[in-house]
From Swiss-Prot:
Gene3D superfamilies: Aconitase, domain 4 (3.20.19.10). Its EC number is 4.2.1.33. One of its GO terms (cellular component) is 3-isopropylmalate dehydratase complex. This is 3-isopropylmalate dehydratase small subunit. SUPFAM superfamilies: LeuD/IlvD-like (SSF52016). InterPro entries: 3-IsopropMal_deHydase_ssu, Aconitase/3IPM_dehydase_swvl, AconitaseA/IPMdHydase_ssu_swvl, IPMI_Swivel, LeuD. Pathway: Amino-acid biosynthesis; L-leucine biosynthesis; L-leucine from 3-methyl-2-oxobutanoate: step 2/4. Keywords: Amino-acid biosynthesis, Branched-chain amino acid biosynthesis, Leucine biosynthesis, Lyase. It comes from Listeria monocytogenes serovar 1/2a (strain ATCC BAA-679 / EGD-e). The keyword Lyase applies. The keyword rRNA processing does not apply. It is an enzyme of class 4 (lyase). It catalyses: (2R,3S)-3-isopropylmalate = (2S)-2-isopropylmalate.
């Protein structure tokens, strides 16, 4: 997993509440087994018109927002089915940070396990961040747990374990390898019985 200590990036806002995983990545695109290639289908039914041309009214299609790496959204983001593909699609599109009012528990875990930092902020803060000009950057300071912008600095909470994983770029396998000596010692002990 790629580490995130301080992330500086552009934002795009999609302030709808209850965006479910079917809207994030429609089930018709889940036939592949790789974790990559899903970004082009992110929010597919909203991003594209029936003729597959980009919907000019959808925020991700705005020319000044196409480099965004921070998604600002509503309440209960990632609700619905528990497909991990939703986190893969967000990351593959290039989102490293999602700022929402709340998340589905399973979706939150899928994000943390796949390198997408889910942050919870109150609606007022998100509404202010959503109005930031396209040319402005927002800073995510993970060690100090702050979202820093021209419209304010907002503290956020994150579990210490997840914070450590993001700061050090550790996934579950890397954490397991941190304990390899203990694992080998245990295996030798069991083998000798």
């Amino acid at each position: 997993m790629e580490e995130i200590k301080v992330h500086i990036g552009k934002t795009v806002a999609l302030m709808n509440d209850n965006i479910d995983t079917d809207q994030i990545i429609p089930k018709s695109f889940l036939k592949r087994i790789e974790r990559t290639g899903f970004g082009e289908f992110l929010f597919d039914s909203w991003r594209y018109l029936p003729n597959r041309k980009p919907n000019p009214d959808f925020p991700l299609n705005a020319l000044d927002r196409q480099e965004a790496t921070i998604l600002i959204t509503g309440e209960n983001f990632g609700c619905g089915s528990s497909r991990e593909h939703a986190a893969w699609a967000l990351l593959d599109y290039r989102f490293r940070v999602i700022i929402a009012g709340s998340y589905s528990d399973i979706f939150y875990m899928n994000c943390t396990k796949n390198g997408v930092l889910p942050i919870v902020l109150p609606r007022e803060a998100r509404e202010k961040l959503a109005k930031i000009a396209a040319e402005e950057n927002v800073t995510i300071d993970l060690p100090n747990q702050q979202v820093i912008s021209s419209v304010g600095t907002y503290p956020f909470e994150i579990d210490a374990t997840w914070k450590n994983k993001f700061i050090n770029g550790l996934d579950d396998i890397a954490i397991t390898f941190e304990h390899i000596d203990a694992i080998k010692a245990y295996e030798q002990k069991v083998d000798s019985i």
